[in-house]
């Protein structure tokens, strides 16, 4: 057994995900996409709105052919990237397409040509909340889930 704390990450958007991670032995969790869509997040409002509007099937992984996979929301840029990957485009052609694409999304709010990095849980996010609200709601939900399972773990 591992004697260091395990932090679960990926696919966690709410208290049920937190509770599941704890029930599997994690000592803590990390949520990425959930906080990208928070009120305090510095990403452009257009980016946040795309996450909030996303459905559970709206993310895609690009970069598998380069060894640098990135999950992001589907848009024109990801469609073009996947097309080029399917055609076995070389690394430099793929790099050229994505050069500056994260900045386009985060700073400029370009939801067509920017990389809208987001996990599969984007479809679970329905509104913009403060970080405090996200944490309090997540912990409360986790406590309820764990209590319903008859486990007593302090969160």
Task: Walk through the language-model features, giving the residues of each.
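Conserved active-site-proximal phosphate/metal-binding subdomains
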Residues: 1-7, 13-155
